[in-house]
Amino acid sequence: MVEAGTRDPLESALLDSRYLVQAKIASGGTSTVYRGLDVRLDRPVALKVMDARYAGDEQFLTRFRLEARAVARLNNRALVAVYDQGKDGRHPFLVMELIEGGTLRELLIERGPMPPHAVVAVLRPVLGGLAAAHRAGLVHRDVKPENILISDDGDVKLADFGLVRAVAAASITSTGVILGTAAYLSPEQVRDGNADPRSDVYSVGVLVYELLTGHTPFTGDSALSIAYQRLDADVPRASAVIDGVPPQFDELVACATARNPADRYADAIAMGADLEAIAEELALPEFRVPAPRNSAQHRSAALYRSRITQQGQLGAKPVHHPTRQLTRQPGDCSEPASGSEPEHEPITGQFAGIAIEEFIWARQHARRMVLVWVSVVLAITGLVASAAWTIGSNLSGLL
């Protein structure tokens, strides 16, 4: 896949007046995935935008809508949720759950082959998601590490259901072209393009081999030569490549990748049951699958955040404060005074050139003068009242 780097013409576009395209995550042969925002619900989303050549292909658009609706009806935490689909101008698009993390391919590149307990931790949700789809009559057709996402919280989810079928229905797709990823195709997909749940089982079997050994079972000079090898050769035993692989995993891969579909597990449900029996027999510990550290999704998120920061810095205006700003330094908040020091310091200094002490004396002097005058007034009032009472009481004698 081609990673996001420079600016893309669709970035900052608003698809269908609702979905803001923020930054490219990765692109492939038929589509580009962006991180985006549903502005109506204020929800982060992943936007898979199909190549513009499909915009006028009614056969593709019809199948694209049907597959999107079918997957949206599935309710399984191991499947990347589909929220919406649409077409904005020259771009059919799919709106999906945004997984903050990376792909299983990126994890394999970072860490290499996995021990059996880690393989089981990956396969459980993958087979669980496929089982839900198989019960609903859906087939993935393109199970591979690139379509298995790992969140930063350790959730493993399967993505891109039905996309191969939609591309196959397009009138621009040449007859006889093998669709899917050559390394993971089942013999029947290579032979005649047919697929059913057992085809997904074959792809998972190849995936198990790759997780245990670090590479796919068939190699060649071209995708076509790799695809055709599985018509005449069985997938080899992983234990022949990596020491310590339990024979139960060899048997799991052999049963999943039998060249005759009738000899395989019937669907993901049957394969999942066998996987659980193996995990119990070997007493494999529980394991949380880590997300890749340097994923395209993480880089896309960092790029978008840096752009937002730059825009904020360029657009920021200085704030004017007409009043004085006081900045408290770390040392300003001192510990309470010890008992040997006075609790209150004497007030010193000046105000308008006059010593503070003079203000204090003046205020105290003014208070004393007020009290003196109040006492004088009260005394005079008392004398007058007393005289009036005396005169009033002797008035009859005088008369």
Curated annotation (Swiss-Prot):
Residues 312-346 are annotated as: Disordered. Residues 1-368 are cytoplasmic. One of its GO terms (molecular function) is protein serine/threonine kinase activity. Keywords: ATP-binding, Cell membrane, Kinase, Membrane, Nucleotide-binding, Phosphoprotein, Serine/threonine-protein kinase, Transferase, Transmembrane, Transmembrane helix. GO terms for cellular component: plasma membrane. Its EC number is 2.7.11.1. It catalyses: L-seryl-[protein] + ATP = O-phospho-L-seryl-[protein] + ADP + H(+); L-threonyl-[protein] + ATP = O-phospho-L-threonyl-[protein] + ADP + H(+). SUPFAM superfamilies: Protein kinase-like (PK-like) (SSF56112). It is found in: Cell membrane. Its main location: membrane. The chain crosses the membrane at residues 369-389. GO terms for biological process: regulation of primary metabolic process. It is a single-pass membrane protein. Residues 390-399 are extracellular. PROSITE patterns: PROTEIN_KINASE_DOM, PROTEIN_KINASE_ST. Autophosphorylated. Residues 19-278 form the Protein kinase domain. The active site is at D142 (proton acceptor). ATP binds at I25, A26, S27, G28, G29, T30, S31, T32, V33, K48. It is an enzyme of class 2 (transferase). InterPro entries: Kinase-like_dom_sf, Prot_kinase_dom, Ser/Thr_kinase_AS. PANTHER family: MITOGEN-ACTIVATED PROTEIN KINASE KINASE KINASE 20-RELATED, SERINE_THREONINE-PROTEIN KINASE YBDM-RELATED. Belongs to the protein kinase superfamily. Ser/Thr protein kinase family. This is Serine/threonine-protein kinase PknL. It comes from Mycobacterium bovis (strain ATCC BAA-935 / AF2122/97).
